[in-house]
Amino acid sequence: MEIGLREWLIVIGIIVIAGILFDGWRRMRGGKGKLKFRLDRSLSNLPDEDTSAELLGPARVLDTHKEPQLDEHDLPSVSMPAREAREPRESGSKRGKRGGNGPAQGDLNLDLDLDGGPSFSSRDDDFVEPAAKSSPAVADKDQPQAEEVLVISVICRDPAGFKGPALLQNILESGLRFGEMDIFHRHESMAGNGEVLFSMANAVKPGIFDLDDIDHFSTPAVSFFLGLPGPRHPKQAFDVMVAAARKLSQELNGELKDDQRSVLTAQTIEHYRQRIVEFERRALTQKR
């Protein structure tokens, strides 16, 4: 039986396919050997455990930033029993302190004129503003009288004024605590400990807050004020006061005003800071 051209082509094709398969199988085996060889070389170059420990060094602990939080222990008690317990102790001292002379931090005469701003009352005498005038003193005898006062007022845009519960919650979050003269003070500690940095008074005479009736309380405006001399670090205390006033203004729909009843601007804030610097310079000069 003779083999034709077709049969030869089939045989040749089979041989070619077999050759291709064999070559591929050979390459695969060769590739596996090379891969294993490269892996072995890589592993042989790795440092031992002692060297690795020296290179890596000790583990580092990363500090994560956490916002300050207030717990129940930070908040002042506004319950009736606490109020009643405080009143007998303070009643006598208030009468004695209100007979003193010269203003001090946390106790300054109030005389806020809201002309040019929202009209809250037909009587200008109903409104008060911290000012360095003669007034009773509530601070200790060792505390110097305030020679200069930096004032930031927050006036409510709502004709109904700031509601007591919302106002109380806002200023407590800023670290202010109810204290002397029935107004709020910001101390060094958020818990109400340490020296007074600045204070906040009601803009309506007599300038106080009644925590017993806070649920029904409202006011058209409040005033933050910082007396000089006052805190040991007045510039830092002023920045904290600005932050508290801004927070109140932003969250309760208020408008910031300076001591001239003008809109509080970045330029005004910088001017306040310059007043602090100038006061500190004069104080250093007097000590010399």
UniProtKB/Swiss-Prot annotation:
One GO biological process this protein is involved in is: division septum assembly
Membrane topology per the entry is: Single-pass type I membrane protein
Main subcellular location: membrane
Asked if Metal-binding is a keyword of the record, the answer is no
The family database entries (SUPFAM superfamilies) matched by this protein are listed as: Cell-division protein ZipA, C-terminal domain
Transmembrane as a keyword of this entry, yes or no, is: yes
**Bias kind Basic and acidic residues: ranges:** 66-75, 83-93
Q: State a single Pfam family of this protein.
A: ZipA_C
InterPro entries noted in UniProt: Cell_div_ZipA (IPR011919), ZipA_FtsZ-bd_C (IPR007449), ZipA_FtsZ-bd_C_sf (IPR036765)
Composition skew (Low complexity), residue ranges? 106-117
* A GO CC term attached to the entry: cell division site
Q: Where is the chain membrane-spanning?
A: 2-22
Task: Locate the region Disordered.
Answer: 66-141
Periplasmic-side positions? 1
Q: Which residues lie on this side of the membrane: Cytoplasmic?
A: 23-288
Localization terms from the record: Cell inner membrane
Q: Write out the entry's keywords from A to Z.
A: Cell cycle, Cell division, Cell inner membrane, Cell membrane, Membrane, Transmembrane, Transmembrane helix
Subunit: Interacts with FtsZ via their C-terminal domains.
This molecule's function is given as:
Essential cell division protein that stabilizes the FtsZ protofilaments by cross-linking them and that serves as a cytoplasmic membrane anchor for the Z ring. Also required for the recruitment to the septal ring of downstream cell division proteins.
According to its UniProt record, which protein family does this protein belong to? Belongs to the ZipA family.
> What PANTHER family does UniProt report for this protein, alphabetically?
CELL DIVISION PROTEIN ZIPA
The record, for NCBIfam families, names: septum_zipA
Protein known as: Cell division protein ZipA
Q: What is the lineage of its organism?
A: Bacteria, Pseudomonadati, Pseudomonadota, Gammaproteobacteria, Pseudomonadales
- Its gene name is zipA
